Amino acid sequence: MRIFAHMEGRKRIEVVAAVIRRGDKIFATQRGYGDWKDWWEFPGGKMEPGETAQAALVREIREELEAEVCVGPLLQTVEWDYPAFHLTLHCFWCSLATDALHLLEHESARWPGAADLGSVRWLPADEQLLPLIARTLKR
């Protein structure tokens, strides 16, 4: 399923994000830089030319968290217009293949459950995923 909120003529950026699940909680990170500093997101980043979404996600999690993930099924693709660009965000369910996570690029992190997802300020594109994630975590 795709969510669209699109305006033509903007720079287009394609990224991947890991919704890392551990039991009834997911891993969330707080941005430590840029226009969206202090907002929360799912870890991940830009895809490189010729790279699959899954390979990009494995690489990005290594770079951002010094961790290994097992990439599961696609949760959802979100299309979102930010003020300066159009974002295509491919979000995958993931699990950790390593125990330790090290924040190399983020300010903070937490493991919210379904009831806690609304307790932080999410980036707009990431926020679109919360209802689906909450329903899944409650099962």
Q: What residues fall within each predicted segment?
A:
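NUDIX/MutT-family hydrolases
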Residues: 93, 102-133
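Conserved S-adenosyl-L-methionine
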Residues: 73-77
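Active-site-adjacent beta-strand/loop module that shapes the phosphate/pyrophosphate-binding cleft
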Residues: 68, 78-101, 110, 133
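Conserved Nudix-box catalytic region and its N-terminal flanking loop in Nudix hydrolases
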Residues: 22-63, 67
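Generic C-terminal helix-cap and adjacent flexible tail
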Residues: 8-10, 134-139
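Short loop segments at secondary-structure junctions
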Residues: 23-25, 32, 95-100, 114-116, ...
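Conserved N-terminal beta-strand and adjoining loop/helix that marks the start
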Residues: 2-26, 46
